[in-house]
Each structure stands twice: as C-alpha cells, then as structure tokens.
Amino acid sequence: MTSVAPALPHPSLRHIEGIIFDMDGVIVDSEPRHQQAFMDIFHEIGYADNHGIQFEDYLGKSDRAVWDDFISMHQPPYSIEDLTSRKQNRLIDLIQKEKPIFETLPALVEKLARKFTLSVASGSLHPVIDVVLKLENLRNFFPNVVSSQDVPKGKPAPDIFLKAANSMQVSPDKICVIEDAAAGVQAGKSAGMTVIAITNSLPSSALSQADIVVSDYESIESLLLGRP
C-alpha cells in the first residue's frame, strides 16, 4: 500500500492560527460599486463633473477619507454624516442587487474555517459589512468583524488589524492577513502580521510589501492548507 503524504501549508505559514480577511476587493468585488455609489452622490449634489476625487488614491481606505478630502476641497452644504449615509445606502442597494461575491471565495472560506479562527477587518461601515456577509451565508464563518468605525485610525494604520487580533485572541505574529490594496498591506505589516496580497484590484508591483502575492484563491488555499 502506498501512503499519501499529508497536505502541508507553505513553510512560512505553518505557524498561522488566525486569518483576517479584508472585505472590499477580497470577499466582494465592491470597488467598482464603491466608485459608482460615490459618483451617484456627487451627481445628486451637483459635483458630477468636478468632484476632484481620484478614486485610485483611496483604494483600501475608508469612506471618511474620501469625504474629508471632498469637503476640504468644496465645502458643500452637507455634513459628513449626511454624505456618508447617502453613499452607504446607495452602495448597499448595488450590492444587494448585484451580489458580487468573488466566485470561488465562499468555498475557500468554508475550508479555512475548519482549521483557523477567521475575522473580517474592513474599511467599510458595519451596515455594509453585514449586507455582504449575509450573501452566501458567509457570516456563519466570521465570528469576529471589525470596521474602520471601530478604531481611531483606518488603514494604512494597523489599528483595525490589531483590534481584530484582540477579538480573535490570537497573537498578531500568528495571524495572516489577506488583502488586495497597498494601504491594507501596509496596515497588516505594521501590525506585525504575515500578509498575502491578491491581485484583484492592483498589479503585483503595487503590492510588493506583502509577504506573498497571488493571483487567485486556489493559490491561497494551497499556501494555507497545502495540496495532497
């Protein structure tokens, strides 16, 4: 009888006990929907053609970062709370209508949840996170969820990942972060965590600070769980 060697994770990841997923661009293909939601609100308030926002500069950052800069540029007669609420509601409408979960993501999450403690740490607000995690019953696999609204500073500061680690009761050096944005990669490294970056939103050259860069979810599965 021929014995089959057990599947083993990548040597640099064998110490990992917890995994933190970014949400936008990792769990859900929401970056285009974020941009559409912002554009819809800019149009509503009369700034469709002169909003002055370069969306690529905010990839991985919170909505507040966008609105802070927009208000600084234009001083519109709207509060940041009003603008944030409008954009959030529009984004929720788009996500509920289009359900843009990455196709192979749910199967990966289910497999990882059998071995690791999982968390979501997202720049989105809790109402948006809740809507996304209801899709494909993903909420069942993420007992710990942290939003940028829960911490003093959003990405690229490490606050959100450190709070997630505390909730997971896992040491930061035993956590792997899965990210798609340079700001998130920087935040994960600053938190003392291992970072796998996936090229859903940016080319590998923009994610070079990550420990490992991959192009698909099958590669993440192989790295963390091994292949038989």
Which ranges hold each PLM region?
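Short, acidic loop-to-helix structural element flanking the phosphoryl-transfer center
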Residues: L8-H10, H15, D93-V120, H126, ...
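An amphipathic alpha-helix signature
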Residues: Q35, M39, D63-D68, Q88, ...
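Hydrophobic patch in the ABC ATPase nucleotide-binding domain
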Residues: Y47, P76, L138
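Residue-level detector of anion-binding/catalytic polar loops
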Residues: A48, T117-L118, T194
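Metal-dependent phosphoesterase signature
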Residues: F70-P106
